[in-house]
């Protein structure tokens, strides 16, 4: 079943790339193609890391001796923390650039991955659950807000559809890599190494894409200021 899901997800991502190429080819007026493509690649990498952390939480908890009740409670804690933190991120986003907040969020998730590598006790798992909750809702909302600023408004519907496809198809790579490393090393903790790599790679691409997107974000900000 897992292999079938991976194959299906790979096909989904491949289709999204083809759809994106079709949009750019059909809509000759779409600007900032490099910035859009690079951001989608960065988004795919770091959001894959986010989904993988969530998916693999059960394995980490079980390895530490959690029963099903404990795992459900940990999941509940994550959701309880995620709701208010998403609201806080939304308020901060009005004062601080989305670029900076996304960078902070990805760095925080990178730390979560590193923390998971060395996690040895149950209390550390609770700390992990809280840390994941702090940034879980914010990073997705911030990514969509950032994407809004770098794409042409007239093509937002199509491009957001492609972004959603990238998000839905981003679950296979991290899970596959974690499974390979875990089976090769026999350690669930070392299985978190690929997660860290996804976040580092995603952050690196995101930093690169900022150079292409800066003028479009500045233009979007000017329009927002004029409307106010």
Where are the regions that the model predicts?
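A membrane-interface helix-boundary motif in multi-pass transporters
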Residues: 180-199
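Helix-to-loop junctions at the C-terminal end of transmembrane segments
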Residues: 84-98
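Short amphipathic helix-loop junctions that connect adjacent transmembrane helices
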Residues: 55-71
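Multi-pass alpha-helical transporter architecture, strongest
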Residues: 193-228
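Juxtamembrane intracellular "pre-TM" segments in multi-pass secondary transporters
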Residues: 8-40, 227-228
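Short, small-residue-biased leader/transition segments that mark boundaries at the very start
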Residues: 1-7
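Structural signature of the two symmetry-related core transmembrane helices
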Residues: 100-115
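Intracellular juxtamembrane helix-capping segments at the cytosolic ends
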Residues: 138-151
């Amino acid at each position: 079943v897992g292999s079938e899901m991976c194959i299906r997800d790979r096909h989904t991502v491949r289709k999204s790339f083809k759809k994106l190429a079709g949009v750019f080819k059909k809509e000759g007026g779409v600007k900032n193609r490099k910035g859009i493509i690079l951001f989608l690649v960065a988004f795919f990498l770091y959001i894959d890391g986010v989904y993988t952390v969530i998916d693999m939480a059960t394995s980490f908890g079980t390895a530490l001796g959690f029963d099903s009740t404990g795992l459900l409670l940990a999941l509940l804690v994550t959701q309880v923390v995620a709701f208010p933190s998403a609201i806080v991120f939304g308020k901060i986003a009005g004062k601080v650039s989305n670029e900076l907040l996304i960078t902070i969020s990805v760095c925080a998730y990178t730390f979560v991955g590193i923390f998971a590598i060395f996690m040895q006790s149950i209390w550390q798992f609770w700390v992990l659950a809280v840390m994941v909750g702090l940034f879980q809702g914010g990073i997705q909302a911030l990514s969509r807000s950032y994407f809004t600023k770098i794409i042409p408004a007239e093509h937002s519907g199509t491009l957001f559809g492609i972004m959603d496809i990238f998000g839905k198809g981003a679950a296979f790579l991290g899970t596959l890599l974690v499974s390979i490393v875990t089976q090769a090393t026999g350690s669930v903790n070392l299985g978190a190494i690929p997660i860290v790599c996804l976040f580092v790679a995603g952050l690196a691409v995101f930093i690169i894409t900022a150079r292409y997107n800066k003028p479009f974000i500045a233009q979007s900000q000017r329009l927002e200021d004029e409307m106010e």
